[in-house]
Amino acid sequence: MYYRGQHVALIVPCYNEEAAIEAVVRDFRKAMPEIDVFVFDNNSTDQTIQVAQSVGAKVVSVPLSGKGNVVRRMFADVDADVYVMVDGDATYDASAVRNLVDKLLDHNLDMVVGCRETKEEIAGEAYRRGHQWGNYILTQSVVKIFGGNFTDMLSGYRAFTRRYAKSFPALSNGFEIETELTVHALELRMPYGEVMTAYGARPEGSVSKLSTYRDGWRILKTIGRLYISERPFAFFGICGLILALISLVLGFPLLTEYLRVGLVPRLPTAVLAASIMMSAALSFVCGLILDNVTRGRHEMKRLVYLGIPRPDTDSER
């Protein structure tokens, strides 16, 4: 079955979601009967697999722990024209799935993010204030570094085209995968959009797997790693500038003293200043070399991306 001529696949990463997965599958099938549902179980110790199979979902087991490993497997194993990814905790609004897919197809986008908004009476329970602030800070960090205008970078509710999914390398292992999904779209200058979606509390018996500080720290490290790999000249240029300033602070008094009396009063300091200046020069050179390598990598990823056709919305199957 096809929706607007497209094979749409719902891909659901799961870990111990027996209390929620049945509602997820049924709600999305009700909202879009044409959707093909895949549940990717990540070493659950409860009845997640059995419950998902009982409501007709196709279940795939992923032995490597971590959401990033699951996303990598989902994009590799599922063959579809449009992918809708949603967490298996029944917190996202299934009725918004048509809005995400329609916006993806109508505006020829490669990714649409479902931005979370909560009702005031359940906001504290569903979307904790600390998570909201953390999401805002991390989202703004990515926007400042990589550009774009994302509102909810860490949303687990997204729609992708086939060419996005098949060009995404998925290098992260855990919950920081959402950061990588966002940066991938930005670095390849992909068209993307956002749709506001309702966000609710988990059903009774379902427990969050998120750790505010641990996962926040991992996301920060991912942003740093991506900054170094995607903006190497900026990173190593800043490092080189700092080293050069330190060298000048140490060496300038020695230089003025040498010009005045013809002697170097503190030879070890002079050697240190010269060594730091050499390190600064090497940092600049490394930045230039790695910047060219990054450009070449971006070109190759862009060619892979362009080699996959966009969804043909003009034909009906």
Language-model segments: what does each one mean?
Residues 26-35:
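Short, acidic, metal-binding catalytic loop of nucleotide-sugar glycosyltransferases
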